[in-house]
Amino acid sequence: HALCAQKNTAKTPVLTTTGERDAATDRLKMTVKDLLAMKAALDKLGVPTTNRRLVLCTDHVNDLLETDQRFKEQYNIDRNTGKVGKLYGFDIYEFANTPYYTSNGVKKAVGDKGDTAGDFHCSFAFYTQRVFKATGSTKMYWSPAENDPEYQRNKVNFRHYFICMFKKADAGVVMTSGYKAEA
């Protein structure tokens, strides 16, 4: 969620898909042209052509599988890492829980669902050298079975802190699905 722009800006563009309309959702499907628009947006920002990562939502993966033979051939190349492959200069991954965006291109808050017409998951691309991740402390919680007379079970749980964010929000692009209600 933190790697996606809040809204469209010059340094973090939010683009919309341009494909054909899905009759069930009124969502415009992602096309290869849209992928190239993401690449062009990063090129325009001066982002180096190496270390570009693209995270596709499941809707956009399905759209591309329907239409693009090259994408279909590269899909699921490495089942161990989840990496789809490299296409158009991107290391491509798939993630089912990308943020929702409104039809106006504004990111919804963490936990908000796409419950309004025109709210869809996004796909996003970023330059890996402009993001960081930090893993914090891990704490283990444990209680012995003697303290659980009802079920006589040992309980174990963990708390782990982790963060992933932009160092500087100037090398990312978001693609959200366009919306076209039936006329």
Place the predicted regions along the sequence by residue.
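Hydrophobic, aromatic-enriched interface-forming segments
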Residues: 29-74
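Sequence/fold signature of self-assembling virion shell proteins
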Residues: 26-30, 67-183
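Long, contiguous amphipathic alpha-helices that act as assembly "spine/axial" helices in icosahedral shell
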Residues: 1-19, 43-58, 92, 145-166
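Alpha-helical scaffold segments that mediate packing/assembly in large oligomeric complexes
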Residues: 1-45, 174-183
